[in-house]
């Protein structure tokens, strides 16, 4: 297999692990390349995750942010597996002490766990896809925004809140959960609408069919920000419109045998 290794470089341990895993995988006959930031740290020829990039597998060493950042860098589908070098690591299925064992066991065709993403248009312009969520928040603290929410052209609600999360099942264990949204099995395809600190007690989260088109209109005159997967942000103003649909291109994760509820139990310590 051709395997690309991506790693956070702000900590010594992930970089050292990237080096040792690369040696191990090469000894097993794999073609190993390194994404440009970690390649620079290790003195290897860099590879850019651009439209010309190709690999059978991307191994990400880091936390959930590293995985989200890697997937947003790709403009086509490549299977990803994460090795947890962060904190919770809900998107990183492999713990450090199991990395060599699990990577050694992988072979083509890889067992895949596709995850639904949402595509986002802002004022008629595509701003990409989100694996976890798109969030509209006030650009100034303690200011309330007003949103009109439409599903398939029908207005279903109007929120006054600090913000609004439009999330995926994968994102249901991230920001949406901390805002009071439900935990949704990642094998279900749906969209979540979760208001942030709503003014009205009657404002509640929605779970919407993934085949629906969701339109969010910012009625408020106050400035706001659109943040996608915690990575990219855009300034939005009065009468801004967002269209959210199910993306035709899911994110592809390697299935290493850890079920969704096993991860919920371990990562969130519910039991």
From Swiss-Prot:
Alphabetical list of InterPro entries matching this protein: ATP-NAD_kinase_N, ATP-NAD_kinase_PpnK-typ_C, NAD/diacylglycerol_kinase_sf, NADK
Example of a GO MF term: metal ion binding
Coiled coil: none
A GO-annotated cellular component: cytoplasm
Enzyme Commission number(s) from the entry: 2.7.1.23
Catalytic activity, reaction form: NAD(+) + ATP = ADP + NADP(+) + H(+)
Active site, renumbered: 64
Annotated binding of NAD(+), by residue: 64-65, 69, 132-133, 143, 160, 162, 173-178, 197, 231
Enzyme class, first EC level, given as a word: transferase
The keyword NAD is annotated on this UniProt entry: yes
KW Iron (keyword) present: no
Entry keywords, A to Z: ATP-binding, Cytoplasm, Kinase, NAD, NADP, Nucleotide-binding, Transferase
Biological-process GO terms, alphabetical: NAD metabolic process; NADP biosynthetic process
Described purpose of this protein according to its UniProt entry: Involved in the regulation of the intracellular balance of NAD and NADP, and is a key enzyme in the biosynthesis of NADP. Catalyzes specifically the phosphorylation on 2'-hydroxyl of the adenosine moiety of NAD to yield NADP.
PANTHER family attached to this UniProt entry: BIFUNCTIONAL NADP PHOSPHATASE_NAD KINASE, NAD KINASE
Protein name: NAD kinase
Species of the source: Methanocorpusculum labreanum (strain ATCC 43576 / DSM 4855 / Z)
Lineage summary: Archaea, Methanobacteriati, Methanobacteriota, Stenosarchaea group, Methanomicrobia
Record gene name: nadK
